[in-house]
């Protein structure tokens, strides 16, 4: 593994190795406290962030490395100076680049023109670090992730894409339950289905909640992406039937709940569920750091 732009570039064994390493780092942090000693990692943010920024900054520190934070400064990467020059400069100083960007093409440019590993910490198409943290969390409760049935509910987006691709590679069953007109990208769904054929997994897209009865895990996300100015009344009309609430858990028999956050309580998920016995949401947030640490250790070993 030279970079992490999308989980589709990883094999099943590489994903399992990352999950195993994440568990090892989580269980024995002192053993890895100097693993990145002398390493400097530039973290770039074109989009706002809480969990991504804090977990990368603290995670790198816990591994003995040094994180250098860059915000959007005078605009997106490539506006003030070319992506080529940006990547070439950063590569002379830093040992890796972690980038949360508007466009996947920016990440591809950083890889093309830079000479250090690049990690996608979110783009318009994928959120691979989130998906690794999600399956790390699932693996803490299910010994064989290939037997897990995971339902994503809400708007098809970058998180959905990475969940489907990761589940497909691992051989799990992943169903995206989205209102009509909000399905995941058709080409990425096609890629996930092809990967699932190889692994024995299953990928589904539906708008019917009855299709996820007897699933193991349900996964929520915000109904409104950053920068979306759709009136709340319209959003609620479209998505409220897909709210994750106690009634839905009873109806489907689902045991565990995930949400990548930020969560809008009483919209896509109720406080009763988010703070309840079925919720793994804050374990999931913690696991962002451990999964990302595993990625950095693998890239910089």
From Swiss-Prot:
It holds the Pfam family OTCace_N. Carbamoyl phosphate binds at residues 100, 127-130, 260, 288. Pathway: Amino-acid biosynthesis; L-arginine biosynthesis; L-arginine from L-ornithine and carbamoyl phosphate: step 1/3. Its EC number is 2.1.3.3. InterPro entries: Asp/Orn_carbamoyltranf_P-bd, Asp/Orn_carbamoylTrfase, Asp/Orn_carbamoylTrfase_sf, Asp_carbamoyltransf_Asp/Orn-bd, Orn/put_carbamltrans, OTCase_ArgI. It catalyses: carbamoyl phosphate + L-ornithine = L-citrulline + phosphate + H(+). One of its GO terms (molecular function) is ornithine carbamoyltransferase activity. It comes from the Bacteria. GO terms for biological process: arginine biosynthetic process via ornithine; citrulline biosynthetic process; L-arginine biosynthetic process. L-ornithine binds at residues 158, 221, 225-226. Keywords: Amino-acid biosynthesis, Arginine biosynthesis, Cytoplasm, Transferase. It is found in: Cytoplasm. SUPFAM superfamilies: Aspartate/ornithine carbamoyltransferase. One of its GO terms (cellular component) is cytoplasm. Homododecamer. Belongs to the aspartate/ornithine carbamoyltransferase superfamily. OTCase family. Reversibly catalyzes the transfer of the carbamoyl group from carbamoyl phosphate (CP) to the N(epsilon) atom of ornithine (ORN) to produce L-citrulline. This is Ornithine carbamoyltransferase. The gene is argF.
């Amino acid at each position: 593994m030279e970079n992490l732009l999308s989980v589709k570039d990883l094999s099943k064994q590489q994903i399992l190795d990352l999950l195993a390493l994440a568990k090892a780092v989580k269980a024995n942090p002192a053993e890895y406290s100097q693993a990145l000693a002398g390493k400097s990692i530039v973290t770039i943010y074109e989009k706002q962030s809480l969990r991504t920024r804090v977990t990368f900054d603290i995670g790198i520190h816990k591994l003995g490395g040094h994180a250098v934070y860059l915000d959007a400064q005078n605009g997106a990467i490539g506006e003030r100076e070319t992506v080529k020059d940006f990547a070439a400069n950063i590569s002379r100083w830093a040992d890796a680049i972690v980038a949360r960007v508007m466009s996947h093409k920016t990440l591809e440019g950083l890889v093309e023109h830079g000479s250090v590993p690049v990690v996608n910490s979110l783009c318009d198409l994928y959120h691979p670090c989130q998906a690794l943290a999600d399956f790390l969390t699932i693996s803490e409760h299910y010994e064989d992730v290939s037997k897990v049935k995971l339902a994503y509910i809400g708007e098809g987006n970058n998180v959905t894409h990475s969940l489907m691709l990761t589940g497909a590679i691992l051989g799990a069953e992943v169903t995206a339950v989205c209102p009509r007109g909000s399905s995941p990208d058709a080409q990425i769904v096609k890629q996930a289905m092809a990967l699932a054929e190889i692994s024995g997994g299953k990928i589904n897209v539906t708008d019917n909640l009855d299709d996820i009865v007897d699933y193991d895990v349900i996964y929520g996300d915000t109904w409104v992406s950053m920068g979306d100015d759709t009136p709340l009344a319209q959003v609620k009309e479209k998505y409220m039937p897909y709210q994750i609430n106690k009634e839905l858990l009873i109806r489907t028999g689902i045991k565990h709940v995930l949400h990548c956050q930020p969560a809008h309580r009483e919209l896509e998920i109720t406080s009763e569920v988010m703070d309840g016995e079925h919720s793994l949401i804050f374990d999931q947030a913690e696991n962002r750091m451990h999964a990302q640490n595993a990625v950095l250790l693998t890239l910089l070993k």
